[in-house]
Design a protein with these regions (language model features):
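Anionic-ligand anchoring segments at beta-strand to alpha-helix junctions in alpha/beta enzyme folds, i.e.
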Residues: 86-114, 196, 214, 379-407, ...
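General beta-strand structural signal in soluble alpha/beta enzymes
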Residues: 67, 157, 166, 186-188, ...
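Short, surface-exposed connector motifs at secondary-structure boundaries
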Residues: 26, 58, 154-155, 215-218, ...
Length: 665
């Protein structure tokens, strides 16, 4: 056994295995298989190839590393501890998966220093890695000058069979290959084991051939514990400047633990005390003491970290010279990284200007996008092959492509799930604001990655058009019903449904000024009138558009989007019958709920119990505002194929029906 300890690299690799196994055992839950199987890959990359600096985790030109298989989080935490990121102590590893610890079950962005993205849903990290690689190429094309490669780094992702089974990886890698993202290097932990058993039961395709078809260079490491072979693979990946690279590393899940390695049982449960003891004996580890790491191993990692500093020092020197030689680029750089940029440039009269003609809110949003792109040069975005319909094309900004990384219009293709992960990755990279777009009914395809946006606090903007039965002729498959309620239910998410130009401008202003909350806009296909009384108060989520002349209104009509005009017209008709109502616009329930109780009570006073909510989607969620005595005019079934002018009356979205329902209270 002693011969296994004569190599400091081997000891350093095994330190990752031991810390991972002990932390998972102490927590009584976790996934030891990946950390044990991929320890050699991670060590070789982090110690000898990754451009990073634990002393400055936010260095802008660092390489990015994404653990797409987030269940293997102890691999990442062990690395962060051994490399000294954020002073992550051994005691933090001992608190793995515990309340309030720095080591949650899956890596969480902004929670643990050195974690580049929240991962856990398999394949998500692959999509975000593609987004980061896109951001790197775009920023490089904007800022680099001859002799000054101020943006020049790689994005690495590590995932396993599960990541490769998930459809999002195919979506993302298909686009990455098309875009020739040569700064993207993906490690495939090919251990041929899934939770239910061998991958032979459900996953027998030739993954390498698939990746070749996507346009990747493919490299195979036959021995996942051979550091030299792994290192050569990384260098070969870097040498290809025309294609992204996919490195298949043949590993053994749970490597080092005799009773578990190569078995499905190594994946998602603690190894057990006896098996950990046997593992340490097998690895020649000098102590059975939990979490023990020899001082010589810590010293070795410290030496590695000291060796990482010169790369950043050289970059800092180059960047200082660059800023002196190109002061206009330094100013632009600061603009890209200014988190308060939108507040400074998107609050002028022209930004909020509108004309009185009726228009679809998707068209009004398109105008806002083009106003924003002129004010914010760091905005990049696009649609899932729908920009002509969602009105998301930025004029005169070019298309992002393998031939033009400076383009600001992204063509994501029909890949909504990957599009959203890529949008997250673009923003996680830093320096850019991103938006993504599709039809509202297909927002379902974006949901898992949008959920990560909310969890991470990444203020990605979603442009969802064709927002109700107003879609009309395309029928129920294309008419959203339950989607609005779903998005409103998401924590840390602002779901806007604006009614006219003023509210659309407010929704966009809220989106681009948001620091930690993603925002979505649900926009109409059909034209809507400009409404008297809408204002910037829409930024509060809900507000009084037209009030009653009485101190206490006879009733309150609440509406959003295309139905606000119905509410306003109903108010006029009711007034003729001596019923004086208040009209409240509710473009964003989420923001309204963030207001003070005093403000909410002012808009919706508790002593006015006669309330009607009007919205051409599911009525789910409106109960909190109309109460037991109120009424909801909404959709309780799927739509139909017909002109919207036929559908709205059929389903009760008319002035006459709103008036009748108010009178019936």
């Amino acid at each position: 056994m002693e011969t296994k300890m004569n190599n400091i690299d081997t000891m350093s690799v095994n330190a990752i295995r031991v810390l991972s196994a002990d932390a998972i055992q102490k927590a009584k839950s976790g996934h030891p298989g990946l950390p044990l199987g991929c320890a050699s890959v991670a060590y070789e990359l982090w110690a000898k190839h990754l451009k990073h600096n634990p002393k400055d985790p936010d260095w802008k030109d660092r390489d990015r590393f994404i653990l797409s298989g987030g269940h293997g989080s102890m691999l990442l935490y062990s690395l962060l501890h051994l490399f000294g990121y954020g002073d992550l102590k051994k005691e933090d590893l001992m608190q793995f998966r515990q309340w309030g610890s720095l080591t949650p079950g899956h890596p969480e962005y902004r929670h643990t220093v050195g974690v580049e993205a929240t991962t856990g849903p398999l394949g998500a990290g692959m999509g975000m890695a593609v987004g980061m690689a896109i951001a790197e190429r775009h920023m490089a094309s904007v800022f680099n000058k001859e002799g000054y490669q101020v943006v020049d780094h790689y994005t690495y992702a590590l995932g396993g069979d599960g990541c490769m089974m998930e459809g999002i990886s195919s979506e993302a890698f298909s686009l990455a290959g098309t875009l020739k993202l040569s700064k993207l290097i993906v490690f495939y932990d090919s251990n041929r084991i899934s939770i239910e058993g061998s991958t032979d039961i459900a996953f027998t395709e030739n993954v390498q051939k698939r990746m070749e078809a996507f346009g990747f260079q493919t490299i195979t490491v036959e021995d996942g514990n051979n550091l030299e072979e792994i290192g050569k693979a990384i260098e070969a990946a870097k040498a290809d400047t025309k294609r992204p690279s996919f490195i298949t590393v043949k590993t053994q899940i749970g490597f080092g633990c005799p009773a578990k390695q190569g078995k499905a049982s190594a994946h998602g449960e603690p190894l057990g005390d006896d098996n950990i003891k046997a593992m340490k004996e097998n690895l020649g580890w000098p102590s059975e003491e939990p979490f023990f790491v020899p001082e010589e191993v810590y010293d070795h990692y410290k030496e590695i970290v000291e060796g990482l500093q010169p790369a950043e020092d050289a970059w800092n020197k180059m960047f200082a010279e660059y800023c002196e030689k190109y002061p206009e680029m330094k100013e632009l750089w600061d603009t890209y990284y200014d988190e308060d940029l939108a507040e400074k440039v998107c609050d002028d009269s022209e930004f909020w200007a509108y004309d009185d003609k009726a228009d679809a809110t998707r068209n009004l949003s398109g105008k806002m996008i083009n106003r924003i792109k002129d004010r914010m040069p760091n905005v990049i975005g696009g649609a899932a092959d729908l920009s002509p319909s969602t009105k998301t094309y930025m004029k005169d900004e070019g298309d992002f492509s393998a031939e033009n990384y400076a383009g600001r219009n992204m063509h994501f293709g029909v890949r909504e799930l990957a599009m959203t992960a890529i949008g997250n990755g673009i923003m996680l990279h830093g320096g850019l604001r991103a938006f993504v777009s599709t039809f509202f009914v297909f927002s379902d395809y974006t949901k898992p990655m949008a959920r990560l946006s909310s969890i991470m606090g990444v203020p990605l903007t979603f442009v969802f058009t064709h927002d109700s039965i107003g879609v009309g002729e395309d029928g129920p498959t294309h008419e959203p019903i339950e989607q609005l309620a779903m998005w409103r239910a998401m924590p840390n998410f602002h779901m806007f449904r604006p009614a006219d130009a003023t509210e659309t401008a407010a929704a966009w202003y809220s989106a681009v000024t948001s620091k930690r909350t993603p925002t979505a806009l649900a926009l109409t296909r059909q034209n809507l009138p400009q409404i008297d009384g809408t204002s910037r108060e829409a930024l509060k989520g809900g507000y009084i558009v037209q009030d009653s002349k009485k101190a206490v209104p006879d009733a309150i009509i609440i509406a959003s989007g295309s139905e606000l005009s119905l509410a306003v017209e109903a108010k006029k008709v009711l007034a003729e019958d001596g019923i004086d109502v208040r009209v409240v616009s509710m473009p964003c329930m989420n923001l309204f709920e963030e207001q003070s109780e005093e403000y909410k009570a002012k808009v919706l006073p508790k002593n006015v119990r006669k309330r009607v909510a009007v919205e051409a989607l599911s009525g789910f969620g409106w109960d909190r505002y109309v109460g037991l005595d109120g009424d909801i005019i909404g959709m309780n079934r799927f739509g139909a194929s017909a002109p919207y002018s036929k559908l709205f009356p059929y389903f009760g979205f008319t002035v006459e029906n709103v008036v009748a329902r108010v009178k019936a209270l």
